[in-house]
C-alpha cells in the first residue's frame, strides 16, 4: 500500500481546503472537508500559532492519519504572556510565568522531546524563558533551575 506523507504548517484551528493543504493533497481523491475538520479539532488549542501538521495518506484506500506537532517553546511562552516577542536583551524582562505554567508547557513539549523526564524538559523551558527575558515566580530562571535540581518543585513535578 503506497503511502504519501504531506507536511504543512497550519495556523491552529484555522485550516482551510485552500493552500497549503489543497495543492498538497489535491488529486488524491480525499474528503478535504473531513481532513480540514480533523486538523482544526486537533490544533484548536494552538489558536494564533503556526503548528506543524503531518498527514499520512494511504493512496489506495484513501485512509489518512493526522499527526500534530507542537509549536516552538518560545511561541508557547509568548502565548502565555500575551506578548508579541521576547526581549532582544535578556536583562530586560518582558514578563513573569508561574511555575505551574512552565510545567504545563513542558508537558506539551514532552512527547517531542529527546528525554522522557519531565524535570529535564522543565529545565529546557526555563532556559528558553531566560533567553527571552522572562522571569519565573519573580526569579531569574537559573535560580528556578537550581531549585528544580534540589527537589524544591518535586511535588509539582510529580516526583
From Swiss-Prot:
Stretches with biased composition (Basic and acidic residues): 137-149
Chain's gene name: rpl11
Name of the molecule in the record: Large ribosomal subunit protein uL11
Matching SMART domains: RL11
Database matches in Pfam families: Ribosomal_L11 (PF00298), Ribosomal_L11_N (PF03946)
Keywords: Ribonucleoprotein, Ribosomal protein, RNA-binding, rRNA-binding
Chain intervals for the UniProt region annotation (Disordered): 137-159
Gene Ontology CC entries for this record: large ribosomal subunit
Family, per entry: Belongs to the universal ribosomal protein uL11 family.
Amino acid at each position: 500500500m503506497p503511502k504519501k506523507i504531506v507536511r504543512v504548517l497550519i495556523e491552529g484551528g484555522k485550516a482551510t481546503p485552500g493552500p497549503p493543504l489543497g495543492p498538497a493533497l489535491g488529486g488524491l481523491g480525499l474528503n478535504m472537508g473531513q481532513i480540514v475538520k480533523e486538523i482544526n479539532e486537533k490544533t484548536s488549542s494552538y489558536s494564533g500559532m503556526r503548528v506543524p501538521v503531518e498527514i499520512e495518506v494511504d493512496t489506495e484506500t484513501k485512509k489518512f492519519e493526522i499527526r500534530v506537532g507542537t509549536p516552538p517553546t518560545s511561541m508557547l511562552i509568548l502565548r502565555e504572556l500575551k506578548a508579541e516577542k521576547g526581549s532582544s536583551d535578556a536583562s530586560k524582562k518582558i514578563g513573569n510565568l508561574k511555575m505551574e505554567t512552565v510545567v504545563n508547557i513542558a508537558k506539551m513539549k514532552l512527547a517531542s522531546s529527546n528525554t522522557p523526564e519531565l524535570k529535564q524538559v522543565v529545565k529546557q523551558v526555563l532556559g528558553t524563558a531566560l533567553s527571552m527575558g522572562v522571569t519565573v515566580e519573580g526569579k531569574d530562571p537559573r535560580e528556578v533551575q537550581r531549585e528544580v535540581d534540589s527537589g524544591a518543585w518535586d511535588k509539582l513535578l510529580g516526583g
